[in-house]
Amino acid sequence: MKTMTCRELGGSCDLEHHGEDANEVIKAQDRHLRQAVAEGDVDHQTALTEMKGRWKRPVSGLKWYRRVQRDFAALPADAGVR
């Protein structure tokens, strides 16, 4: 299990997302951004818009995805978790 924050994934806060792989934390970030914006949090709107835009621009979106996977792989496992 590893941890990445909203900010590390392009967001505006330090909420921690935990997962066994990068895809799990990306999905958690997606849910977090959508929920925050739905609740009226304008600080997260930019990150949500950028996330949606990645799917419209596959080359830059894939570059972001690969960077997140690389960053996730470089993280140490969470303490106390095997």
Region annotations inferred by a language model:
Residues 1-82:
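Metal-centered catalytic cores of metalloenzymes
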